[in-house]
Amino acid sequence: IAAVKKAKAQGLKIPVVYNTSGYERVETLKNLEGIVDVYLPDFKYTDTTYAKRYSNAPDYFDVTKAALAEMVRQHPAPQFTDKQEAAVRGIEEGIMTGGVIVRHLMLPGLLKDTKAVIRYLYETYGDSIYISIMNQYTPMPFVENIPELNRKVTHREYDKAVDYAIGLGVVNGFIQEGGTAKESFIPEFSGEGLE
């Protein structure tokens, strides 16, 4: 936090993006107020059964819901650089400089919960957030004992989720096309080099 504050005081012009699981304490987020420009949280489930089974977090929905509310309190509407601000900042026009983009990674077989996540986000926040519906789930070897997760999301499942979002009226959204469910999209989490 101190480094970002110092960089901003010295003229940092690019937006600070906080990439988070979404499972955050509100107190932590309050400490980031005025530091983070764009929040990029995940919102995985509404159903506590899935949250407990796949994330060992039966309180996932309540914790993430409260965290997201705090993020939106800090950034109640998306902001983008216009031509003048882009010139001043030395960055491209149309770059998000404030706001919240909520990512939902669709899991195989959980279309009903994906729809519940999209419905909750849109009914609660409307166009004040962006919703990114992701289809890049890639089954890794450690899920071979969880049969329902041991496959990719089908095109049909994903298309139904996207159609559902469009039917609700979601316009501030992102979708994925093409072959995004590959191991090459997964960063290495070996912890090498960390102390």
Name each model-derived stretch.
Residues I1-V38, T48:
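Conserved Radical SAM active-site core
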Residues A3-Q10, I35, E70, Q74, ...:
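Alpha-helical structural signal in soluble globular domains
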Residues K5, V26, K30, K65, ...:
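Amphipathic, non-transmembrane alpha-helical secondary structure
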Residues E33, S55-P58, P187-E192:
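Short low-complexity, flexible loop/linker segments enriched in glycine and/or proline
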Residues Q79-E195:
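Auxiliary Fe-S-binding modules of radical SAM enzymes
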